[in-house]
A protein has these predicted regions:
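Flexible, polar/low-complexity N-terminal or interdomain linker segments that lie immediately upstream
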Residues: 385, 389-452
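Short acidic-hydrophobic, aromatic-tinged amphipathic segments that line or gate anion-handling sites
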Residues: 461-462
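A short acidic, often aromatic-flanked loop/helix-cap motif at beta-alpha or helix-coil junctions
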Residues: 465-469
Length: 492
C-alpha cells in the first residue's frame, strides 16, 4: 500500500499533467488515457520503480470501485429520456445484439488462442466487450461528426456495461460455484440483478426529491449540492452491497432515477460529478498502468496480441456491420461506428471485479485484458483525431443519410398538419412586413459550404441538431413567445 506522500504525488500528477497535456492532446494523435497509462508504466516496477502495486492492492480496489460507480451513475444521469427514445435504431442495435456478438467472437478467440476453459473464455469475452467512453470522448465531442453518429457511440459506450455487468456477475457465480440449485440461482438473480437496481432507484428517486424540495425552500448552496450528488452514488452503492445486492447496478439505477424523474436539480451536481469522475478515471489509468506493467510478464504475449487484433479488427466491425446492415446510415458511418469501439478503463475495472471475486486464474485474465486494452488505447487514441477529420471532410463534401437523423421535421413534431411550405418570394414578403418569422438555415453541411448565399438574420443550425436547438430555445424563452413564434426552416 503506497504511503500518504505517494498518494499526494499521484493526485498532483493527475491534476497538473491532465491540465497541461489537454491542449496538446486535442491537436495531436494522442489521448489522455495513452498519456496516463504510459505514466503508470513509467513509474511501475519495470520502469523507474517508484510505485509497486498488485492486482489485489487496497488502493487500486478503492479507486477502481469509486471510479466505476461514478461512471455508471453519471452515464445514467446524462441519459435524457426523450433523447434516448428518439435516438433511433442505430445505438439500440449496437448496444444489444452488437454487444452480444462481440462477446461471442471474443470468447471463441480467447478459447482458441489462449486455451482457457469455457467459463474463463466467456469471462474474457464479456470483459473485452465493454466500450470505453473515456477514449471516445474526443470523438463524441467533435461537432463535425453528425449528431446521430456521435449519439450512437455515446449511448452505446455509456450504457453497454449494463448489458455486460449482469452477464459478468452470473459468470463469476458459475466460476465460483456460488449457486448449485434452481433455488440458489433464483435467490442469486433476485439479490444481484433485482435488489441492487431496486435499492439504487429508490435512493436516487428519494434523494432527488429531497434535494429538489430543500433547494426550493432553503436555497441550498451549489457547493453543497455538488457534494450531495457524490453522496447519493456512495449511499446507493453501500446500501445495495449491505443488503446483498450489487452496488454497481445500484449506482446506475440511482442515476437513471435522477434522469427519468426529471426533478429540477442544479446542473452543478452533474458538473462536479464529471470533474470528480475525470480525476478518478485518470488516476485509475496510472494505477492500472503500474499493475499491467508487472502483469505483462505473466501474459502469453503473442496469443494476447492476436486476441487484441481479433477484438479490434474483427469482432467489433463484424458486429456493427451485421446489426447496422439495414440502418439508414452510409457505409462511411458504419465503418466509423464499427472502428470506434475502444477497450479501456471499463474493461480493466470489470477484470478487477473478477480478481476481487476470487475466481481461479483471474490474474491471468487480467494480464490478457491489460494487453488488449493497451493495444486498443494506443490504436484508437492515435486514430481518433485523423479519422474524425477524414469523416468530417467527407460529410462536408456530400450528403449522407445519417446527417438527416434528428432533422428539421422534429421541430414540428405533434403539429405535422400545421406544417406548410413557403416559397422564397413569399418568405421575402413576410420578412419585409409584419412580425418576422425566425428563419433557420438547416441545410446539410455540404450544401451550406458550397452555396455561400445566406438569408439575412437566419440562424445556422445543422440538420441533425435542430431538435436539440429547439429544446434549448424553448427553455430560454417565455411560453407566450414560443407559442406565437413562426419558424421557417430553410433546406435544400
Amino acid at each position: 500500500m503506497p504511503d500518504l506522500l505517494t498518494a499526494f504525488a499521484l493526485a498532483a500528477a493527475v491534476l497538473t499533467v491532465s491540465a497541461l497535456a489537454s491542449g496538446i492532446v486535442e491537436r495531436a494523435p494522442l489521448s489522455l488515457p495513452i498519456v496516463f497509462l504510459g505514466l503508470g508504466f513509467l513509474i511501475g516496477e519495470h520502469g523507474l520503480g517508484i510505485l509497486a502495486l498488485g492486482a489485489e492492492d487496497a488502493l487500486l480496489e478503492s479507486v477502481a470501485t469509486l471510479t466505476l460507480a461514478l461512471v455508471l451513475y453519471l452515464e445514467a444521469v446524462r441519459m435524457e429520456a426523450e433523447e434516448v427514445r428518439g435516438a433511433g435504431l442505430v445505438p439500440m442495435l449496437s448496444l444489444g445484439p452488437g454487444t452480444l456478438i462481440i462477446v461471442v467472437v471474443a470468447t471463441v478467440g480467447a478459447y482458441l488462442l489462449l486455451g482457457t476453459s469455457v467459463v474463463e473464455s466467456l469471462l474474457l469475452g464479456t470483459i473485452l466487450a465493454s466500450t470505453d467512453p473515456v477514449v471516445l470522448r474526443d470523438v463524441v465531442r467533435n461537432e463535425r461528426i453528425p449528431r446521430s453518429v456521435r449519439q450512437a457511440l455515446n449511448i452505446e459506450a455509456g450504457t453497454n456495461d449494463i448489458v455486460i455487468l449482469p452477464i459478468l456477475l452470473v459468470l463469476i457465480a458459475v466460476a465460483n460455484a456460488e449457486a448449485t440449485s434452481v433455488a440458489g440461482w433464483a435467490l442469486f438473480a433476485v439479490q444481484v440483478l433485482l435488489l441492487g437496481p431496486a435499492v439504487g432507484f429508490a435512493i436516487g428517486a428519494g434523494a432527488s426529491w429531497l434535494m429538489s424540495r430543500a433547494d426550493d425552500r432553503w436555497a441550498i448552496s451549489e457547493v453543497y449540492q455538488s457534494l450531495y450528488g457524490i453522496g447519493v452514488v456512495l449511499l446507493a452503492f453501500v446500501c445495495a452491497q449491505a443488503l446483498g445486492g450489487d452496488g454497481f447496478l445500484a449506482a446506475f439505477a440511482a442515476g437513471f432515477a435522477v434522469a427519468i424523474l426529471n426533478f429540477d436539480l442544479c446542473q452543478c451536481i452533474l458538473d462536479y460529478g464529471e470533474t470528480t469522475s475525470e480525476m478518478a478515471m485518470l488516476l485509475s489509468f496510472i494505477l492500472f498502468g503500474v499493475v499491467i506493467s508487472d502483469l505483462f510478464a505473466e501474459a502469453p504475449l503473442v496469443p494476447a496480441l492476436l486476441l487484441a487484433l481479433i477484438v479490434i479488427f474483427v469482432a467489433r466491425p463484424l458486429a456493427i456491420g451485421i446489426v447496422l446492415r439495414k440502418a439508414a446510415v452510409s457505409n462511411a458511418a458504419r465503418a466509423f461506428i464499427g472502428w470506434f469501439g475502444p477497450r479501456g478503463l471499463n474493461s480493466l475495472l470489470l477484470a478487477l471485479l473478477v480478481v476481487g471475486a476470487g475466481v481461479p486464474g483471474a490474474e491471468s485474465l487480467m494480464a490478457v485484458t491489460g494487453v488488449v486494452v493497451t493495444v486498443s488505447i494506443v490504436v484508437h487514441g492515435a486514430s481518433a483525431t485523423p479519422l474524425s477529420s477524414l469523416y468530417g471532410r467527407a460529410i462536408e463534401g456530400d450528403t449522407y443519410p445519417e446527417e438527416r437523423e434528428g432533422s428539421a421535421g422534429g421541430i414540428f413534431e405533434g403539429a405535422a398538419n400545421e406544417t406548410v411550405r413557403i416559397k422564397p418570394a413569399q418568405l421575402a414578403a413576410v420578412l419585409e412586413g409584419g412580425p418576422p418569422p425566425l428563419v433557420l438555415d438547416v441545410r446539410n453541411r455540404s450544401q451550406y459550404e458550397k452555396d455561400k448565399r445566406r438569408i439575412p438574420g437566419a440562424v445556422r443550425v445543422r440538420p441533425d441538431e435542430v431538435e436539440e436547438w429547439a429544446r434549448a430555445w424553448e427553455d430560454e424563452h417565455p411560453r407566450s413567445q414560443v407559442q406565437g413564434q413562426r419558424i421557417v426552416a430553410y433546406c435544400t
